[in-house]
C-alpha cells in the first residue's frame, strides 16, 4: 500500500529543518519510496556531464537535489503558525 504524505506535486512548501532551512519553493516531484521530495530552487546539486556532440567541452549541469519529507511544511500552515505566534501575548 502506498504511503500518504502531507505534500504533493505543485504544493508551495517551506524547509523547516536541515541545511536548507528557511528556503521555500514548489514541489516538483515526490519520491515516495525514499520519503523525499524535489523542491524548485532548493538543495541544488552539480552534475558533471562528459563530452558529447551536444556538449563538445563537457559541462556542469545544476539540478535540484531531494529533501526529506519530514523537513517540509506547507507554506499556508507555516504562515498560519507564524501569525499565531505573533498574535500571542508575551508572558511576563
From Swiss-Prot:
- Report which superkingdom the organism of origin falls in: Bacteria
GO BP term, pick one: translation
Q: Any idea which UniProt keywords this protein has? A: Ribonucleoprotein, Ribosomal protein, RNA-binding, rRNA-binding
Cellular component (GO) terms are:
ribonucleoprotein complex; ribosome
Gene Ontology molecular functions: rRNA binding; structural constituent of ribosome
Annotated coiled-coil segments of the chain: none
* Keyword ATP-binding annotated: no
Q: Which Pfam families match?
A: KOW, ribosomal_L24
Signal sequence interval, chain numbering: none
Q: What does this protein do?
A: One of two assembly initiator proteins, it binds directly to the 5'-end of the 23S rRNA, where it nucleates assembly of the 50S subunit. One of the proteins that surrounds the polypeptide exit tunnel on the outside of the subunit.
Subunit annotation: Part of the 50S ribosomal subunit.
Q: Which family does it belong to?
A: Belongs to the universal ribosomal protein uL24 family.
Q: What is this protein called?
A: Large ribosomal subunit protein uL24
Amino acid at each position: 500500500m502506498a504511503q500518504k504524505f502531507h505534500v504533493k506535486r505543485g504544493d508551495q512548501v517551506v524547509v523547516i529543518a536541515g541545511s536548507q532551512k528557511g528556503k521555500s519553493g514548489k514541489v516538483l516531484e515526490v519520491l515516495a519510496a525514499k520519503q523525499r521530495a524535489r523542491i524548485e530552487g532548493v538543495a541544488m546539486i552539480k552534475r558533471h556531464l562528459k563530452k558529447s556532440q551536444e556538449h563538445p567541452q563537457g559541462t556542469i549541469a545544476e539540478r535540484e537535489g531531494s529533501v526529506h519529507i519530514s523537513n517540509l511544511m506547507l507554506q499556508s500552515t507555516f504562515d498560519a503558525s507564524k501569525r499565531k505566534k505573533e498574535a500571542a501575548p508575551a508572558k511576563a
